């Protein structure tokens, strides 16, 4: 056989042998992967739990290793309450990580409520223990910190699970969530504070998209119904100050709190509020008294009412559920 033809024949035989070896090894590789698992297979399995609302399954694969008070919302109840959960579009083939052959990286392309984002998982090869599906373990799961604070909103709930909110933007409380679109409900408001629920989008915590929520800050507003209670309490206090016997109360003007006073009449009582502040202080129209102490005097007073708040800025109420309000009067 000529040298050229012999060379071509040898090349052909080599190629055929290579293909034959590849086909021969395929069952071996398949068996190894079945026994040991694959990095991308572990990522797919983990993401399937999150997509299906199975927080317990995801936690069984990767635990965040944090105190219980920070992981209150990593439950099936909360994850299934999400109005939208992740959809897995693709999972890449594994590539070597920084730790050499025993570390791999897998990038997943995900979609949440129409917004697409990617997340890269780091995995490492470990000894396979009983119950493990793979020798490959995800280092860090998809746990996202959400800082929560509130003005006049001491607590909040998601999916029936409640927790405390921080008192201000400078001191929020952080909680972990799995990816999803959640509704945060304000709690602990009482009858005289209004606050809106807020929609919170949790992706992967990178905040690469403006769609993802960076923090939650509730804003509780004093209810307008407080104005009616302020007028009611102010009128009651003014009538008490215009009545002999109760005119000696500390909230009454000093001019009326004299043993020389023999008669008092309330000539004018405020009908409206002139101003209101966020701290629960209200200014009312002036009131006018006429009193006698040997001679007749007209007394015009400035009327101010203050709603008593607890430490969270929530109006305190009495046994009947009415707000506690103090009224002061000063001579004009």
Question: What does each model-found stretch correspond to?
Answer:
Residues 1-8:
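Terminal targeting segments of Actinobacterial cell-envelope proteins
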Residues 10-30:
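Hydrophobic membrane-insertion alpha-helices, especially the h-region
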Residues 31-78, 153, 221-260:
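Core segments of small alpha/beta cavity-forming domains
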Residues 55-115, 249-276:
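Short solvent-exposed beta->alpha transition segments
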Residues 94-167, 171-174, 283-332:
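Exposed beta-sheet edge and beta->alpha loop/turn motif
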Residues 174-191:
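A short, solvent-exposed beta-strand micro-motif common in secreted/extracellular proteins
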Residues 189-224, 311-312:
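Structured interaction patches on ligand/partner-binding surfaces of diverse proteins
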Residues 224, 228, 232-332:
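Membrane-lipid interaction segments
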